[in-house]
From Swiss-Prot:
Function in brief: Binds to DNA and alters its conformation. May be involved in regulation of gene expression, nucleoid organization and DNA protection.
Keywords per UniProt: Cytoplasm, DNA-binding
Lineage, uppermost ranks: Bacteria, Pseudomonadati, Pseudomonadota, Alphaproteobacteria, Rickettsiales
Subunit details: Homodimer.
Membership in a protein family: Belongs to the YbaB/EbfC family.
Name this polypeptide is given: Nucleoid-associated protein RT0857
UniProt superkingdom: Bacteria
Annotated organism of origin: Rickettsia typhi (strain ATCC VR-144 / Wilmington)
Cell location: Cytoplasm, Nucleoid
Length: 107
């Protein structure tokens, strides 16, 4: 039979590690780039856009669709990096236990 006090200590330790991982993620920035760095987006660990940089060559009406696509690609690039880091941080906090598919840190 598992010692309940030991189980409780492990759960508290895991909870503390998860909180630390969430705080670290919230303070981390992720950069997504598209079009050979014509568009760059920086997001927070919470997935919020912090900065958008657009090369002046794209600021023409005839480049509108290209710019829209590049913004989408840059954001998705940054978000993917954030999601991967989030999964790695959470997995580390859980002492290497595997996570169910689609499970994410609750931000």
């Amino acid at each position: 039979m598992v010692n309940f006090n030991q189980f409780l200590k492990q759960a508290q330790s895991m909870q503390k590690k998860m909180q630390e991982a969430q705080e670290q993620m919230a303070n981390t920035r992720y950069t997504g780039k598209a079009g050979g760095m014509l568009v760059e987006i920086i997001i927070t660990g919470k997935g919020e856009i912090e900065k958008v940089s657009i090369d002046e060559s794209l600021l023409k009406i005839e480049e509108k669709e290209i710019l829209e696509d590049l913004i989408k690609v840059a954001f998705n690039d940054a978000k993917q990096k954030c999601d991967e880091d989030s999964q790695n941080s959470l997995s580390g906090a859980l002492n290497g236990m595997s996570l169910p598919p689609g499970f994410k840190i609750p931000f």
